[in-house]
Curated annotation (Swiss-Prot):
High-conductance voltage-dependent solute channel with a slight selectivity for cations transporting triosephosphates, dicarboxylic acids, ATP, inorganic phosphate (Pi), sugars, and positively or negatively charged amino acids. Its main location: plastid. The chain crosses the membrane at residues 2-11, 17-28, 33-42, 56-64, 71-80, 102-111, 117-126, 131-140, 155-166, 170-178, 181-189, 213-222. It comes from Oryza sativa subsp. indica (Rice). This is Outer envelope pore protein 24, chloroplastic. Residues 1, 29-32, 65-70, 112-116, 141-154, 179-180, 223-224 are cytoplasmic. Residues 12-16, 43-55, 81-101, 127-130, 167-169, 190-212 are chloroplast intermembrane. GO terms for biological process: regulation of monoatomic ion transmembrane transport. The keyword Ion transport applies. PANTHER family: OUTER ENVELOPE PORE PROTEIN 24A, CHLOROPLASTIC-RELATED (PTHR35284:SF1).
Length: 224
């Protein structure tokens, strides 16, 4: 059994989350229970609890007992002309009765991997007027630098992301959303002791009077 504890600090607000994952030795299914601090803030409750059943690379089922939200995800991949093609179908809905319940949402995601350095991805939400097309290019022999331009046809806008990995588990990522003029910088570190750390800052370039938004996260993994 594996346990994960995550802490997140955003301005003057701190949140925490914990996950327990159990994989039967005779099966490739994985059972997972995740809870945020909302599950314990006012005594034990179902709020903030998510139950997951998944078979990696095949399907995933998420259930939030408090809101009765359900998410189904099915994925598959195959070789087509020596190119890896991957497809993911995601359907989100709620079992809660009432006229105010949010509408169901269905999304399709596909990717075509040309080689280890080049991949084309496409995502579309059924009922929407557009899609997102992303190209990923990993530069160099070790592919430590990744460049990812993305075009949103619905908003007619570009997003750009550049990630640089370093020896030792460090990585720096910069993203820019042209539609919102939002610039984000992330630094992450993966530790050999089963922990990871992340510090992020985002800047609203459309209103330079706003202070940057700072976020710090830490994740710890344990074997039980």
């Amino acid at each position: 059994m594996k346990a994960t504890v995550k802490g997140r600090y955003e301005g003057d607000k701190a949140t925490a989350a914990a996950t327990l994952a159990f994989t039967p030795s005779a099966a490739d299914l994985r059972f997972k229970a995740s809870a945020t601090d909302a599950a314990f803030a006012r005594g034990p409750s179902l709020e903030g609890l998510t139950l997951t059943l998944e078979k990696p690379g095949s399907f995933l089922l998420d259930l939030k007992p408090h809101s009765k939200d359900v998410r189904f995800q099915f994925m598959n991949s195959a070789l087509l002309l020596d190119r890896r093609v991957s497809l993911t179908y995601t359907h989100s809905t709620t079992l809660s009765p009432g006229p105010a319940k949010p509408p169901a949402r269905t999304a399709l995601d596909g990717s075509l991997t040309f080689d280890p350095a080049n991949k084309l991805s496409l995502s579309h939400t059924l009922g929407s007027s557009g899609c997102r097309v992303k190209y990923s290019y990993a530069h160099g022999q070790d592919r430590l630098t990744t460049i990812e331009p993305c075009f949103d046809t619905a908003n007619n806008a570009w997003d750009f992301a550049v990630t640089r990995k370093f020896q030792g588990g460090d990585a720096i990522k910069a993203t820019y959303q042209a539609s919102t003029k939002l610039l984000a910088l992330d630094w992450t570190r993966d530790s050999k002791i089963g922990a990871s750390f992340k510090v992020a800052a985002s800047f609203d370039l459309s209103d330079q009077s706003k202070a940057p938004k700072l976020i710090a996260e830490s994740t710890w993994n344990y074997e039980i």
